[in-house]
Each structure stands twice: as C-alpha cells, then as structure tokens.
Amino acid sequence: PFWARVLPQVKAAHPYSWIFGEVIHGDYPRIIEESTMDSITQYELWKSIQHALETENFFELDWNLKRHNAFLDSFVPQTFIGNHDVTRIASQIGPAKAALALAVLMTVGGVPSIYYGDEQGYVGVKQERFGGDDDVRPKFPGSPAELSTLGEPTYRLHQALIALRRRNPWLLDARTEAVKLENKHFVYRSTS
C-alpha cells in the first residue's frame, strides 16, 4: 500500500510526527497495520455518541464502546465529536447535550480532538450541495477579543475537561465499561 511505503520515510525524517488518517468505515486495525499510520478517525464512536444523546438510547453507545475497547488493543483511535465534514454537534443535538458529548469524548480512551469553533459552541448545518460545508467552516474573528461572549461557558467546559485529561494521562488507552445502562441513563467507568 501507498502509505506503508511513504510513512516510514516521513517518520525517519520527522521521528516525533504522529500520522492519522480519516477513515469513515472499514476494518480499522487492519488499516492501521497495513498503512503504518499511528491512528485513524473513530467515526463509529462519533456517530454513537451523537445518536445516543439525540435519541436518548444508550445501548448503541455501549456497544460501540465495547468495540472501541477492542480497537485499543491494536491502536489508540483519534476521537472526536465534530469535524469539517459533519453538522456541528451543537446544531445536531443542542448545546446541553453537546456538553455531555464532550464529557464522553474526554473521559474515554483515545486521542481526542476538538474541531475549531466547537469550543465556542459554534453551530452550523452541513448541506449536500455546492458550498454546503460553508456553514460548518466559518471564518474565525481576527482576535479572541472579537469572539462572542455567548461561547464563554462552552469554552470554560472545554478548558476544564482538557485539564482533567492532562491530569489523567492514563485516559489515553483507558477501557470503558457500563456500570448502569438504561435507555435514558448511562453510567460508565473508564479504567486503565
């Protein structure tokens, strides 16, 4: 495969690089092994976090967390709740549930990433048309002082959960298990 030929050269020249690929579906561990990438995007987890909070049915999320645990045996997935190709999480499930999605993202195994603007509670709906990404890819203001103060609580939550993550580096490869699972309630434990 192309990446298996190219990435060793990249890593030889840049030994501290960390390479991940955007993979929507497929055999994630096999793709990692054959490509020599360090990680890939964990779309299954993204979708199940969003869907569980949107429908208030946590069984899909529990199932995908079990799969996620299995992925962690082979590699550490790049996890997210928003990116450049999807409707923003605050638009999809509302700001309160977006905060819960962030809490899940930051308390399960993986390498979490934050899509720019999500830390400010940006909204935007992806549309299937020419220019349909424009709403989810807005221009940032010229300086932080120009940001709306409406995003301040979301920003502070991001700061707190990122700090939690930094204080607990074991979360990188933590395994997650259900403690209590019902349609509208899900308590889980992450351990390493």
Residue positions per predicted region:
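Short, solvent-exposed helix-loop connector elements
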Residues: 89-93
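Solvent-exposed loop/turn segments at secondary-structure junctions
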Residues: 25-27, 83-87, 120-122
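Conserved active-site segments centered on acidic
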Residues: 107
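Carbohydrate-binding surface patches
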Residues: 178-192
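Acidic/polar loop patches that form or flank catalytic/metal-binding clefts of enzymes
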Residues: 20-21, 111-118, 169-175
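Active-site-proximal helices and loops of the catalytic beta/alpha 8
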Residues: 1-77, 95, 104, 123-160, ...
